[in-house]
Amino acid sequence: MKSQTFFLLFLVVLLLAISQSEAFIGAVAGLLSKIFGKRSMRDMDTMKYLYDPSLSAADLKTLQKLMENY
């Protein structure tokens, strides 16, 4: 009975360690993406990179309104 209890306790501690390390790795990856600024590593606003000289301000406003709920 002692070995089963020890094994269960060991597995619970191992599961907690794995979940904590996953959160830590995710936080480090988020920090690195902010530091290096890779576009593929973070969600970028689609309107930020939209530039076409043939579009007027009214066209851009209409596009932004259409993309609000997208």
Swiss-Prot record:
Expression sites (tissue/organ): Expressed by the venom gland.
Annotated compartments: Secreted; Target cell membrane
Residues cleaved off as propeptide: 40-70
Post-translational modification Phenylalanine amide, affected residues: 36
Main location as per UniProt: secreted
Keywords noted in UniProt: Amidation, Antibiotic, Antimicrobial, Cleavage on pair of basic residues, Membrane, Secreted, Signal, Target cell membrane, Target membrane
Signal as UniProt keyword: yes
One GO BP annotation of this record: defense response to bacterium
Signal peptide: 1-23
The keyword Ubl conjugation appears for this protein: no
One of the record's GO cellular component terms: membrane
Domain comment, as recorded: Amphipathic and cationic peptide with an alpha-helical structure.
Function comment: Antibacterial peptide.
Family statement drawn from the similarity comment of this UniProt entry: Belongs to the non-disulfide-bridged peptide (NDBP) superfamily. Short antimicrobial peptide (group 4) family.
Name listed for the protein in its UniProt record: Peptide BmKn1
Lineage, broadest ranks: Eukaryota, Metazoa, Ecdysozoa, Arthropoda, Chelicerata
